[in-house]
UniProtKB/Swiss-Prot annotation:
Protein name (database record): Ribonuclease VapC3
Top EC category: hydrolase
Organism: Aeropyrum pernix (strain ATCC 700893 / DSM 11879 / JCM 9820 / NBRC 100138 / K1)
SMART domains: PINc
GO biological process: maturation of SSU-rRNA
GO cellular-component term (any): preribosome, small subunit precursor
Gene name as annotated: vapC3
Top-rank lineage group of the source organism: Archaea
Residues annotated as binding Mg(2+): 19
Domain PINc: 14-121
Cofactor(s) needed by this chain: Mg(2+)
UniProt-listed CDD domains: PIN_Nob1-like (cd09876)
EC number: 3.1.-.-
One Gene Ontology term of the molecular function aspect: magnesium ion binding
Function: Toxic component of a type II toxin-antitoxin (TA) system. An RNase.
């Protein structure tokens, strides 16, 4: 994982990986603990309010922008292909899943913060937690 500033201990730390919806919904700042997001999510966050929230979280050190490993991206793609949903996922969605996998492989207890039902189901299939932002959710 490129850009990693801290790992997780064997006993685990909690980490929440944010998709674009966490910024658009304005919910990112209310989430507890370590927050992380991949670079492609930054590219998708365009509106002024969401962008301000993202930049505030980055500048205060609450949010880490981390690139997922190639290994984790391959695993996320493979699982999406098996589930028959690869065509429904954006590059940012795949990076969110892959980053969550990387953090889990480091020993973190990881959840993906998203309202995207496809992303929720894949996260659950991969043994990751899910944080719903505005809607009840698929899992």
């Amino acid at each position: 994982m490129r850009g990693s500033t801290q790992g997780c201990s064997p006993t685990g730390r909690e980490a929440i990986v944010l998709d674009t919806g966490a910024f658009i919904a304005g919910k990112a700042a209310a989430l507890p603990g370590r927050l992380a997001t991949p670079p492609r999510v930054l590219e998708e966050v365009r509106d002024r309010g969401s962008r301000s929230l993202l930049e505030l979280l980055q500048s205060t050190g609450r949010l880490e922008v981390l690139a997922p490993s190639t290994r984790a991206l391959e695993r996320a793609r493979e699982e999406a292909r098996r589930a028959g949903v690869l065509g429904r996922l954006s590059g940012a969605d795949l990076e969110v899943l892959a980053l969550a996998l990387d953090l889990a492989w480091q020993g973190c207890r990881v959840a993906v913060a998203t309202d995207d039902y496809t992303l929720q189901r894949l996260a659950a299939r991969l043994g990751l937690g899910v944080v719903r932002l505005r809607y009840r959710g698929a899992v």
